[in-house]
Amino acid sequence: MLDAKLIKANAALVEQQLEKRGLSGVLKPFLALDEERRKILVQVEERKNFRNNSSQQIGKMKKEGLNPADLMEEVRQAGQQIKELDEELARVEKEIEKILLNIPNLPHESVPVGEDEKSNQEVRRWGEPRQFNFEPQAHWDIGPALDILDFERAAKLSGARFTVYKGAGARLERAVINFYLDIHCGEHGYREILPPFMVIADCMVGTGQLPKFAEDMFKLEGKDMYLIPTAEVPLTNLYREEILEAKDLPFYLTAYTPCFRAEAGSHGRDTRGVIRQHQFNKVELVKLCEPQNSYEELEKLTKDAERVLQLLGLPYRVVVLSTGDMGFSAAKTYDIEVWMPGYQDYREISSCSNCEDFQARRANIRYRPDPKAKLQYVHTLNGSGVAIGRTVAAILENYQQEDGSVIIPEVLRPYMGGLEKINRPEA
């Protein structure tokens, strides 16, 4: 959530920044309501001053033997007016909060300006896409042929956009999860968390999924709770409504969780394979840090996500997202896109974002820089470290062999009981 004081003090500048995200005129309702709020506060103050002064006057009149009945009636009416004004003030402030909760974060000055992904800028590449001496297959063909991915039975169980992993496929998924957690905890200094997979609505508001993106979430019927769309939600909200110690920052947190998304706006996109699912596994990275360090931490976070792909030998590129392609809560985002031979293209496998104080303000996560300093909001960062299903898909496509088998990357073999290759089942 943006700082209301910042908006009022720099309305034109904030409007200009929001226009970079393709939004125009979004501050007008806020500014109009804020002016209404100011006028109500003036009226409340006037009524309270009248009531206080009149109360003193009534006391004097009684001492002097005068009848204060008329003035007492005016005081009673003033009290009623204050009550009505307070109710109106609460309504206006609720409307202001509603508007603020639907305004996205402001882009960092280094973010390229553009309408959509066409304006994203490539930052670097790692690895060379493999040159095949045969026609490479897509993972949605490789997996079923190996009898490790079953889309038809998944549809029988749950409908579209689900996958059943079987045998070596299930083991490969689990191997990738454990490998990622071991690297992030053992080499990169993250603390592993195993959070609940359901959260209350306040947590979804804190990280920015609600209220704007409610249709993309799975809500529990009859309860004010949601299935998590990403572990970013519980990890960040672990410290909701808390004051942290500066000496304890930064926090590096990681978690493996299943993620649940309705994908309401993705009809017709990536209908085959595991790229866009209602349920998928992911290892998430979250950081809470002091504001002056957050962009350095973003670079480190992105490198941490890149590292696991390097160890797997999967070619990728890093792009910085344009203002029109960034997520709602982000001030700056790097996407890591892995090479997928079946698509003959790079596909997103991780997004690494600095949200600055946007989420912390919504979730009220603060810290005190030193014992005498005023409380400040921390900066929050998050990134996939990385998506598990998409990793499995990338392994199947990049390590496929002409006979239909798939080589297991060396770093995963200890997690696979020494298995070096997944072969097609014998007829």
Swiss-Prot record:
Uppermost EC category: ligase
Domain of life: Bacteria
Compartments in which it is found: Cytoplasm
One term of GO molecular function: transferase activity
Reactions catalysed, as given in the entry: tRNA(Ser) + L-serine + ATP = L-seryl-tRNA(Ser) + AMP + diphosphate + H(+); tRNA(Sec) + L-serine + ATP = L-seryl-tRNA(Sec) + AMP + diphosphate + H(+)
Residues given in the record as L-serine binding sites: 230-232, 284, 384
Any one of the GO BP annotations: selenocysteine biosynthetic process
CDD domains: SerRS_core
GO cellular component annotations of the record: cytoplasm
E.C. designation(s): 6.1.1.11
Residues binding ATP: 261-263, 348-351
Xref: InterPro entries: aa-tRNA-synt_IIb, aa-tRNA-synth_II, aa-tRNA-synth_II/BPL/LPL, Ser-tRNA-ligase_type_1, Ser-tRNA-synth_1_N, SerRS_1_N_sf, SerRS_core, tRNA-bd_arm
Biological pathway: Aminoacyl-tRNA biosynthesis; selenocysteinyl-tRNA(Sec) biosynthesis; L-seryl-tRNA(Sec) from L-serine and tRNA(Sec): step 1/1
Gene3D superfamilies: Bira Bifunctional Protein, Domain 2 (3.30.930.10), Serine-tRNA synthetase, tRNA binding domain (1.10.287.40)
Oligomeric and partner information: Homodimer. The tRNA molecule binds across the dimer.
Reported function: Catalyzes the attachment of serine to tRNA(Ser). Is also able to aminoacylate tRNA(Sec) with serine, to form the misacylated tRNA L-seryl-tRNA(Sec), which will be further converted into selenocysteinyl-tRNA(Sec).
Record text about domains: Consists of two distinct domains, a catalytic core and a N-terminal extension that is involved in tRNA binding.
PANTHER family according to UniProt: SERINE--TRNA LIGASE, SERYL-TRNA SYNTHETASE
The family this protein is said to belong to: Belongs to the class-II aminoacyl-tRNA synthetase family. Type-1 seryl-tRNA synthetase subfamily.
The protein's name: Serine--tRNA ligase
Source organism of this protein record: Syntrophomonas wolfei subsp. wolfei (strain DSM 2245B / Goettingen)
Gene: serS
